[in-house]
């Protein structure tokens, strides 16, 4: 299949470029994403029914009638809906200071003056300068959207008024503000652009402050809907968003970009593919583009040299540790209304190295507290805690694969998470008691999933040097190659989106900006069904052939696909469309002659549960498969399988093909005998099966959790940590607990698939 444009990366920038080219110009666009989930930092991940939005915490300037809303409405076909956050969308907490930020900028200014009456003049000037500098930054954005002659004129106009914009935030505050408390309060949102006041340009500070002056908004149903609604317009125009596609090289001929080389991770084996198109857009960052995907020597290296040197001078940005919390109850029960909380131990925002060290010791200096479920309207309820740090603090584990970094790394994450939760508790009393499950990501996690150098998810740091330098922008020195996203625009969701707009404008040439501006004025057109047009490779129409209730909360589901799929491997999963722009992942229990067998739990009561409970035989949907990297290792070692609930599903597929199954062991956990799937499914099983019942005693079963069985039965089962591969699948809490036990017992080969 031929495409007009290839976009590398499916973050908000890449999808904006692809969506505009598809909807406004009818281009067939192929979007390639290395992760198994589209959306970049707008994607969400799920654990046992709960979901967290990894990179979207609030978005400003999307009120009805705003320019930002116009872009989202157009690209989503009007299907993306929004929830407004509380009036006090941000709260700044310091020793002796607790200030709530109103969505009314006039009221916010008055509240600041009431709190700091001696600084009234400085506060008035501050808001005036924020608006003035924001206009200066906007001129920079527009340069990337218009033809070169017009951009040169705008650049000249920008030079006349850039002194304040290119000072540091600290320099500005020290010059105009006397009160240490007010300086700290005004700089509180530096986490939204990733640099403390001494390093950040006042330009980016003003841009972010201005962005939120009218309050915060959040996508109804979660940020994953951004990618899913944008994707439909891309597919309707004949394009595709393909996941598990790692671009390893941008191909050039005679100095011009002509295609990409890809490692395709979807099937049974990783294999190389080449895609060609007249236009290539990279939305994975300038550094990855110029230093990794293109030659750094020869003619291409010479052309990209200035951009690479600029990136080297700018250095690396900031990363973070994020703690994801599932809550037992609605956080409104402890007085939380859905606004964000910025908690600080002192007025000092500086000392990155010192604060990174204290974070590792379990004493964070600051923490950002967010409640995604209250913003999205989803349940179960969730919270997120974020503290900024540098990647080098975790560098000693960088060479180890994800999930195999050992007990010291796990203990470090637990210590950090406890410290962050303690600090959050100081501003949100009662939060700790609500916590039901904890998962922690580090800069290594961000680096793994986004490929950003050092896990710096904001891209090149927004220092004064970045704003004094010639902007990277969407144009490159390589013909037919463009940049999109944050590096072509600015930090954050809206900054990356504007980078995507700029790239689309440049791809379309001199008439690009007028074409897109005209398209935005047309009413958005929804694509009501993901199967209402020809489907891209990897997606299949499916019909529900049968469903059978195996236990009170688990269904066995069989779907007939419209065609056979290519090679797959046991352990992989399928992604099922469950309606309303929502997709859910289910491990493949079996796949033969285009018949897909799944085990689906309805225990969480979410969208997937409602879909399968209400679907009748003959119901139609769309399935994407195969995906995922959970698979049997070809090691020849003994295997120990540990599963709870529908975590048995991928193992059923493994059992059907595993050699020497009689030498293997399965520990299957459930609460009662009526939930024992091993007794209700006709399938090959390992030679030793231990049924672990946590709430009932029964003959021939182990009474206790699977984590207890690992230690209590190790001798009887002759389990040797040094010669055993462990496969672990089930609820996220069980996987976390079992992994901790296995690490303590000395197991080093542990493959996990948390649900």
Descriptions of predicted regions:
Residues 179-193, 364-368, 426-490:
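A glycine-rich dinucleotide-binding beta-alpha-beta segment and adjacent secondary-structure elements
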Residues 2-135, 461-462:
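N-terminal glycine-rich phosphate/pyrophosphate-binding loop and immediately adjacent elements
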Residues 94-200:
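Rossmann-like flavin
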Residues 534-619, 670-672, 693-696:
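Ferredoxin-reductase
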Residues 218, 248-378:
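Mid-domain catalytic core of redox enzymes
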Residues 330-441:
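C-terminal segments that line or cap access tunnels to active or ligand-binding sites in enzymes
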Residues 604-755:
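FNR/FR-type flavoprotein reductase catalytic core
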Residues 209-257, 261-271:
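Helical element adjacent to the flavin cofactor pocket in flavoenzyme catalytic cores
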């Amino acid at each position: 299949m031929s495409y007009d444009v290839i976009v590398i990366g499916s973050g908000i920038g890449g999808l904006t470029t692809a969506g505009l080219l598809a909807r406004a110009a009818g281009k067939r666009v192929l979007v390639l994403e290395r992760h198994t989930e589209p959306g970049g930092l707008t994607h969400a991940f799920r654990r046992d029914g709960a979901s967290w939005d990894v990179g979207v915490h609030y978005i400003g300037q999307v009120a009805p009638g705003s320019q930002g809303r116009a872009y989202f409405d157009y690209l989503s076909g009007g299907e993306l809906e929004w929830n407004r956050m509380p009036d006090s969308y941000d709260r700044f907490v310091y020793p002796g200071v607790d200030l709530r930020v109103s969505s009314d900028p006039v009221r916010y200014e008055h509240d600041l003056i009431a709190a700091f009456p001696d600084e009234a003049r400085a506060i008035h000037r501050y808001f005036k300068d924020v608006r003035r500098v924001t206009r200066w930054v906007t001129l920079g954005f527009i340069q990337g959207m218009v033809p070169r002659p017009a951009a040169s004129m705008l650049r000249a106009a920008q030079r006349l008024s850039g002194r304040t914009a290119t000072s540091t935030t600290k320099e500005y505050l020290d010059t105009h503000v006397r009160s240490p408390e007010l300086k700290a309060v005004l700089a509180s949102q530096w986490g939204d652009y990733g640099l403390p006041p001494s390093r950040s340009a006042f330009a980016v500070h003003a841009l972010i402050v201005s962005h939120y002056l009218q309050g915060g908004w959040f996508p109804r149903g979660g940020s994953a809907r951004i990618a899913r609604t944008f994707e439909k317009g891309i597919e309707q125009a004949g394009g595709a968003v393909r996941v598990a596609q790692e671009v390893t090289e941008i191909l050039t001929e005679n100095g011009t970009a002509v295609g990409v080389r890809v490692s395709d991770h979807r099937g049974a084996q990783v294999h190389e593919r080449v895609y060609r198109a007249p236009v290539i857009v990279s939305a994975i960052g300038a550094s990855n583009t110029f230093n990794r995907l293109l030659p750094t020597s020869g003619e291409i290296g010479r052309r990209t040299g200035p951009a690479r040197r600029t990136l080297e001078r700018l250095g690396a940005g900031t990363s973070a540790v994020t703690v994801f919390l599932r809550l037992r109850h609605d956080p409104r029960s402890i007085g939380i209304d859905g606004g964000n909380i910025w908690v600080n131990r002192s007025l000092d925002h500086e000392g990155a190295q010192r604060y990174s060290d204290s974070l590792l010791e379990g004493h964070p200096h600051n923490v950002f507290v967010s409640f995604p479920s209250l913003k999205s309207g989803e349940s179960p309820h969730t919270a997120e805690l974020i503290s900024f740090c540098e990647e080098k603090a975790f560098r000693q584990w960088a060479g180890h694969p994800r999930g195999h970094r050992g007990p010291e790394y796990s203990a470090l994450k637990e210590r950090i998470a406890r410290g962050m939760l303690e600090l959050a508790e100081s501003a949100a009393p009662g939060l700790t008691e609500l916590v039901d499950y904890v998962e922690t990501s580090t800069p290594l996690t961000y680096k793994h999933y986004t490929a950003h150098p050092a896990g710096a998810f904001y891209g090149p740091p927004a220092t004064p040097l970045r704003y004094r330098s010639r902007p990277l922008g969407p144009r490159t020195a390589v013909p037919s190659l463009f940049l999109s996203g944050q590096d072509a625009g600015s930090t954050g969701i809206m900054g990356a989106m504007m980078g995507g707009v700029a790239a689309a404008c440049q791809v379309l040439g001199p008439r690009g900006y007028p074409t897109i501006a005209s398209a935005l004025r047309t009413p958005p057109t929804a694509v009501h069904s993901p199967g209402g047009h020809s489907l891209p490779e990897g997606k299949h129409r499916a019909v529900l052939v049968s469903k059978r209730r195996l236990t009170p909360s688990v269904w066995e589901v069989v779907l007939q696909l419209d065609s056979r799929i290519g090679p797959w491997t046991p352990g992989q999963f399928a992604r099922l469309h469950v309606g309303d722009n929502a997709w859910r992942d289910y491990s493949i229990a079996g796949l033969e002659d285009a018949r897909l067998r799944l085990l689906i739990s309805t225990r969480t009561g979410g969208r997937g549960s409602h879909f399968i409970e209400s679907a009748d035989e003959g119901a139609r949907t769309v399935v994407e498969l195969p995906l995922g990297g959970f698979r049997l290792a070809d090691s020849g070692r003994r295997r120990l399988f540990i599963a709870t609930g529908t975590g048995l599903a991928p193992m059923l597929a493994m059992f059907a093909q595993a050699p020497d199954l009689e030498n293997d062991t399965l520990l299957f956990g459930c609460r009662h005998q009526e939930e024992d799937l091993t007794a209700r499914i006709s399938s090959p099983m390992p030679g030793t099966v231990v049924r672990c019942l946590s709430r009932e005693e029964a003959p021939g079963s182990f009474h206790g959790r699977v984590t207890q069985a690992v230690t209590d039965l190790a001798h009887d089962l002759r389990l040797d940590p040094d010669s055993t591969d462990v496969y672990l699948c089930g609820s996220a809490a069980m996987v976390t607990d079992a992994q901790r036990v296995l690490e303590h017992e000395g197991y080093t080969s542990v493959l996990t698939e948390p649900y």
